[in-house]
Amino acid sequence: MKISSSIFPIISIFILLSISSVTPSDSDDSDDFDDFFQCLPKQSDSSIPITDAILTPNNSSFQYIYQLRANNLRTFLSATSRPVAIITARHPSHAQAAVICAKRHDFQLRIRSGGHDYEGLSYTSDVPFVILDMFNLNSIDIDMSTETAWVQAGATTGELYYRIAEKSNVHGFPSGVCTTLGIGGHFSGGGYGFLIRKYGLSIDNVIDAQLIDANGRILNRKSMGEDVFWAIRGGGTTSFGIILSWRIKLVRVPPRVTVFTVQRTLEQGATELAYRWQQVAPKLPKDLFIRLQPEPINNGGNNKTVRVSFIGHFLGQADGLLRLMNVSFPELGLTRNDCLQMSWVESTLYWAGFSNGSSIDVLLDRVAVNKVFAKEKSDYYKAVIPKQGLETLWQVLMDIENIFVQMNPYGGRMEEISDLETAFAHRAGNLFKVLYGIQWSESEGGVNATARYVELSRRLYNAMAPYASSNPREAFINYRDLDIGSNESDETDFEDAKEYGAKYFRNNFIRLADVKAKIDPKNFFKNEQSIPPLPSH
């Protein structure tokens, strides 16, 4: 859904009234608010007035826009404060002005593109803050002569897939399964999907970028330098600046691909198959990706069991897939009836959970419809989970029920790229990455049940500790998890940051902190899990 510009009325004449509703009683603070709002028009392009893009709490559209892209109700409804303003940037100069004026008047800036941060750090803070909403900066400019595209930060993965398909049926791009992810944040943490084994991460196919630094300058790859370009690919861009756009290299895909889902319960041998999957999936040819997804179900009456789904994507036709599976993973028993052949863009709908035959127009729906209360955690596995460990996993799933697990194989292209190539350090040596999630609804307790469900997510995470990576126990930054370490909203202690930094970035953390010290030495861009400047020696 594209938000009409008509819902953003000119508010310049109402600025002072809006300020009064959020301004502390202290007169100096009042001056800061007033000065901040007066600063914005002076620092932006007057031909596209930024006043049209500013929302304050007294504006009728403020609450709607604030919650529209706040996708985790757990973080949104438990927030102790709301932004003093939302700047719905429609021009790069609006984003530049937000940086310059927030820095000048001591407001924290939170940057939101799709609003899928699992801990809500793109739209919440415990200190006075402004949201810079990139949603309207969503242009996608594809050049088929060079097989490249410039994609603005506010575009979604679904829009990107749709625009590629408009130009070609033999091109695609390796990024997320969810089609409402904002490109700005998704790529900055790495960006992965079902093409990961063939083409690596999204960032492995990024060739340039436009970044606004803490001084409000727009930098490209050449002007930012290779160190910064290295850091923003996998290091979490919001520690270094604001991504305006990425230049990507499109990848080749066949005209027809094959997808499948095979499901087996514990009674049908799912444990043996899951054990075998760990040995096979990371070593399959690059063209084949098979996700393992276990879930608890009722097997008649009150009998609980676990059903394991093997969800596959093959860059080729069904006959070739069947020949490959009969050699590499015959135990799964894949048949021709299990296979669906379709175009690559249609396969993005399959992975996103749309029904077979859905129009690709659904890729243009930009906002997640179903918002839930959720808590997510992640793991990397470097060794096969023994059957005893799988049985532990099954038991916890049956005990908790609301938990979901996704296990995504590595290998292939991920095995070939050095940990040092980009800031993303989880490469060779990993068999698979795991997402653990728990979701609940308002009827199941809503925000008041947060403590209970978060504790349940930790129970599963702790149960799998003996089998996951260790020293450090690695985690994926795009599955943000404050449990693994955090700072206060307005502080970034280096020693505290090392705790989560080592888990997200392994040995790349120190280099990231060094880059941070060069591009943002005063630490303007920060959040509870940002990268601090490396202390001087």
Descriptions of predicted regions:
Residues 2-537:
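Soluble FAD-dependent oxygen oxidases
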